[in-house]
């Protein structure tokens, strides 16, 4: 049975790159009726926290990436935190020490740094040259009597070609002579990544390791441990780096990189999942919008590119805007409420039926202007009380047209004649005014829009008027007429 895993370090939030790795593992597991495990690589004791671990799990759940075994769900292959598996690592450490594939190293940091500097001065690759490879029991005893705490190093075989048939990158060959003996257990007894990950993948029966390209250089070290222990090696698939639109590695300077940042801004999870799936995976055909189920059916490692993926925020915004337009209005209302409350546009506490209806109408009125839901805050000034923003530039010039006072007066007259201010009652007024004044549509619509919002573009006028309400509309129109009177 196919088994895959996602193994984040709980030292911070789930980032876009990690979310993509989790997604690709999830998709392959679902496609092949396999098992998806999520575990925690928490051996960085200073930086790891249960809070970060939980936040990562919540981010995965928000993306609807569900796992079969692991953190917070349990399973038959636990425990799923590395700090709870130390006794298991010790068993395998003892096996490597007994077979001579590992040894204790007592070199100090100063000695290692000097060796590193000497190799660099010769133009050679920095690596450990094996000073402690053949220590006698007496030499070990002397070091320990001096208070030196050893690490455990893996004895790298010399002159070996390490071949990796990567499912994404093809055949990759490494030379063991360029690696040097590396640490597998630190002096405090905590295993290093390259050792612990092998034991975890083995004991959890992982068949496929799908992870970021940055781990490719670790793979020969892990393969050597598999071979020394006589363990089967999983299939590897190293997915490409994610670059910004300038072709550089993503960083904080490129904006938000954590999944929670996009959740906080009101991106829809299905849009984020769709977007990150297309960073490195090319589905068959021309379609670019997929449900999670559709992605599962179409996914294969053969269609994952080894070329760098590009994080294009404009593409994410485009995709999210599409999903917003497709979303249920009630869901969008729920998403909009916290942002509107935050700015005081609606009251705290449970909304009345009328207040909730106002939010629903407001969101639908501006839906074509939304790339993410936090932008509902950007249009409130159009539709709530108070003066409209003062028009400037071309907008002010349009208001100074000679037909404008008559258009505004006629609009006021017709509004006052309505029994109720609703979209269906307001919408016909503009055609009526156009017909009665014999003016072009733009000569009617634009002055009214600018008078009410101060802007030349925005939501439909027949939406703005009911949202503002008659009192606010009349107030803003009166303010505009006063502005014009003062400038004439």
Swiss-Prot record:
Binding residue positions for ATP: 252
Source organism: Desulfitobacterium hafniense (strain Y51)
Protein name: Glutamate--tRNA ligase
Gene that produces this protein: gltX
Cited function: Catalyzes the attachment of glutamate to tRNA(Glu) in a two-step reaction: glutamate is first activated by ATP to form Glu-AMP and then transferred to the acceptor end of tRNA(Glu).
E.C. code: 6.1.1.17
Needed co-factor(s): Zn(2+)
Lineage of origin: Bacteria, Bacillati, Bacillota, Clostridia, Eubacteriales
Subunit structure as annotated in this protein's UniProt entry: Monomer.
The UniProt record lists the keyword ATP-binding: yes
GO terms for cellular component: cytosol
Pfam families for the chain: Anticodon_2, tRNA-synt_1c
């Amino acid at each position: 049975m196919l088994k895959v895993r996602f193994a984040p370090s709980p030292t911070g939030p789930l980032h876009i790159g990690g979310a993509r790795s989790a997604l690709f593992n999830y998709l392959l597991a679902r496609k092949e009726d396999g098992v998806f495990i999520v575990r925690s690589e928490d051996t960085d004791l200073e930086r790891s926290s249960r809070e970060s671990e939980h936040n990562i799990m919540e981010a995965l759940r928000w993306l609807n990436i569900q796992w079969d075994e692991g953190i917070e769900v349990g399973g038959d292959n636990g425990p799923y935190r590395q700090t709870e598996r130390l006794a298991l690592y010790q068993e395998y450490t003892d096996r490597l020490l007994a077979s001579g594939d590992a040894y204790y190293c007592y070199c100090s940091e100063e000695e290692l740094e000097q060796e590193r500097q000497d190799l660099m001065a010769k133009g050679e690759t920095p690596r450990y040259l094996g000073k402690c490879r053949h220590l006698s029991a007496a030499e070990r005893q002397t070091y320990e009597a001096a208070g030196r705490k050893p690490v455990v190093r893996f004895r790298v075989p010399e002159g070996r070609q390490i071949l990796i048939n990567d499912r994404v990158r093809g055949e990759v060959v490494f030379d063991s002579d360029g690696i040097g003996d590396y640490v597998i257990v630190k002096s405090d007894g905590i295993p290093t990544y390259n050792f612990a990950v092998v034991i975890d993948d083995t004991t959890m029966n992982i068949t496929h390791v799908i992870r970021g390209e940055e781990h490719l250089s670790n793979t020969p070290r892990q393969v050597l441990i598999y071979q020394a222990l006589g363990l089967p090696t999983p299939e590897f698939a190293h997915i490409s780096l994610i670059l910004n639109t300038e072709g550089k590695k993503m960083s904080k300077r490129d904006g938000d990189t954590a999944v929670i940042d996009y959740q906080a801004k009101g991106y829809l999870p299905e849009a984020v999942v769709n977007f990150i799936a297309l960073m490195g995976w090319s589905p068959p055909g021309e379609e670019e919008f997929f449900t999670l189920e559709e992605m599962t059916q179409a996914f294969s490692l053969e269609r994952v590119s080894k070329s760098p993926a590009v994080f294009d925020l404009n593409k994410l915004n485009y995709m999210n805007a599409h999903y917003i337009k497709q979303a249920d209005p009630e869901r969008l209302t729920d998403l909009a409420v916290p942002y509107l409350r935050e700015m005081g546009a609606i009251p705290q506490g449970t909304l009345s039926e009328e207040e909730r209806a106002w939010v629903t109408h407001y969101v639908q009125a501006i839906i074509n202007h939304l790339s993410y839901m936090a932008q509902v805050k950007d249009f409130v000034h159009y539709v709530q009380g108070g003066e409209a923003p003062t028009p400037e530039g071309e907008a002010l010039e349009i208001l100074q047209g000679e037909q404008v006072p008559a258009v505004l007066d006629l609009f006021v007259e017709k509004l006052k004649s309505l029994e109720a201010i609703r979209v269906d009652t307001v919408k016909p007024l503009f055609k009526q005014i156009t017909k009665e004044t014999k003016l072009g549509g733009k000569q009617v619509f634009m002055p009214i829009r600018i008078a009410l919002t101060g802007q030349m573009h925005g939501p439909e006028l027949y939406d703005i008027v009911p949202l503002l309400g008659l009192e606010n509309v009349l107030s803003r129109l009166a303010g505009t007429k006063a502005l014009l009177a003062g400038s004439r």
